[in-house]
């Protein structure tokens, strides 16, 4: 395989380039809070996130929904069948956390692409490894009973995965509503609004056009320790 195909290129871009010879990729858009797939849906396509953020959550019998990952641009998801080698139904609830644009392809054609271009497997493994790490961090975040600690932990995860350097700190490059944050950490909009207000008063964060800037992540991490 030509190394220029995979070197320093997002996985979605690689599959888009391969599209003419291997698969007809489909580009879809979803508004915020729209479901991409439900638990139990047939696992028929693999998704590559082009723009925005996608929330993966696990839904339990009691109706409780726990966020396990927040995917950023260039992430791949819906790949459980590829990993196990067996056809299976969807395990997670995938929802557009922001307006998103996705590239999707039939799972059979992705399997064929991986067979013909083995280097793609390494790219996919790297992406999955990053997601496993984030899932562990999300579980630790939701283990906090105190909502202030949950919010701070969540903001630090966002800094790591969506943060860009800014003159006054790290700007989380997502437009986040208070409701969206509340849904991600298992809280309420009213509580999140109050807690964000406290952090602003303490000069820990600032918010401009729904984008949060964390002025000092280290200082923020010490707020609820």
From Swiss-Prot:
InterPro entries xref list: cNMP-bd_dom (IPR000595), cNMP-bd_dom_sf (IPR018490), Env_Response_Regulators (IPR050397), HTH_CRP (IPR012318), RmlC-like_jellyroll (IPR014710), Tscrpt_reg_HTH_Crp-type_CS (IPR018335), Tscrpt_reg_NtcA (IPR022299), WH-like_DNA-bd_sf (IPR036388)
UniProt keywords, alphabetically: Activator, DNA-binding, Transcription, Transcription regulation
Organism lineage: Bacteria, Bacillati, Cyanobacteriota, Cyanophyceae, Synechococcales
Binding site for a nucleoside 3',5'-cyclic phosphate: 9-131
DNA-binding residues: 177-196
Annotated ranges, domain HTH crp-type: 145-218
Full protein name: Global nitrogen regulator
MF-aspect GO terms: DNA binding; DNA-binding transcription factor activity
Functional description taken from the UniProt entry: Required for full expression of proteins subject to ammonium repression. Transcriptional activator of genes subject to nitrogen control.
Pfam families: cNMP_binding, HTH_Crp_2
Alphabetized Gene3D superfamilies for the sequence: Jelly Rolls, Winged helix-like DNA-binding domain superfamily/Winged helix DNA-binding domain
Keyword tRNA processing appears in the UniProt entry: no
